[in-house]
């Protein structure tokens, strides 16, 4: 018996990778990474009905995601299996997609993390249980469960929050319109003669962290450029903007970003890019500190 239906609306924030190093490969064949994640004020919105007559997941503003095989549906399935008998109820979710898909911004992982947080609390699942579900759904989901600046290593299972991190606040995002670059395609094409050296623990002080970020890189950039040559042009255009502190690709691409200390400089850059490159998606946002 479903009983009273509860309705919720929650936001799922996108992430950017301030750096991403490939430091090895596991015995299971997966690449071992080190990265600093920061979350930004670009959100998918999830409308959730718990105890609904309906069940399932619907996506709005993007039609290319399967209703039956997606990160939200997988997260719900894992949560149901961890519930005490009789606790789980029908769940209906409508996801309004504002985060570009297959773009290196972890939109699908963010959506899964949002539903894990909400249903986990409603259904009495422990923090450890929610973390276990997150790791089962995808490598970016554990850090998205926190949605705060963090150092992530391994295959996404090791998350160290960086509460004292203070980063340039303003962000300009750019990606080629209608280009979808899957994580799998980039890693399948990735080949290196030598892995990056592990950095160990990142500095917690904000000055040290920014210095580390500036000296680091995204090891997947060259591979992404082979698949989407436009990425190289985007990075050069971002770096040329007045006030740009850093330009870099996020995740496996194809979205790139620039960081600014000055909001007016970021806005000027957005106006310039939109006027010069109508073929690009350009978005101005901020880091969630």
Curated annotation (Swiss-Prot):
Residues forming the catalytic site: 15, 140
Q: Which GO terms describe its biological process?
A: isopentenyl diphosphate biosynthetic process, methylerythritol 4-phosphate pathway; terpenoid biosynthetic process
Chain residues that bind ATP: 100-110
Signal peptide interval: none
Q: Which InterPro entries match?
A: GHMP_kinase_C_dom (IPR013750), GHMP_kinase_C_sf (IPR036554), GHMP_kinase_N_dom (IPR006204), IspE (IPR004424), Ribosomal_Su5_D2-typ_SF (IPR020568), Ribsml_uS5_D2-typ_fold_subgr (IPR014721)
- A single Pfam family, by name? GHMP_kinases_C
- Substrates-to-products reaction catalysed: 4-CDP-2-C-methyl-D-erythritol + ATP = 4-CDP-2-C-methyl-D-erythritol 2-phosphate + ADP + H(+)
Q: Which UniProt keywords apply?
A: ATP-binding, Isoprene biosynthesis, Kinase, Nucleotide-binding, Transferase
A single Gene Ontology MF term assigned here is: 4-(cytidine 5'-diphospho)-2-C-methyl-D-erythritol kinase activity
SUPFAM superfamilies (UniProt xref) = GHMP Kinase, C-terminal domain, Ribosomal protein S5 domain 2-like
Q: EC number(s)?
A: 2.7.1.148
Transferase as a keyword of this entry, yes or no, is yes
Q: In which pathway does it act?
A: Isoprenoid biosynthesis; isopentenyl diphosphate biosynthesis via DXP pathway; isopentenyl diphosphate from 1-deoxy-D-xylulose 5-phosphate: step 3/6
Q: What does this protein do?
A: Catalyzes the phosphorylation of the position 2 hydroxy group of 4-diphosphocytidyl-2C-methyl-D-erythritol.
| Family to which the UniProt record says this protein belongs | Belongs to the GHMP kinase family. IspE subfamily.
Q: Which NCBIfam families match?
A: ispE (TIGR00154), PRK14608.1 (NF011202)
Please give the name of this protein.
Answer: 4-diphosphocytidyl-2-C-methyl-D-erythritol kinase
Organism, by scientific name, is Anaplasma marginale (strain Florida)
Question: Source gene?
Answer: ispE
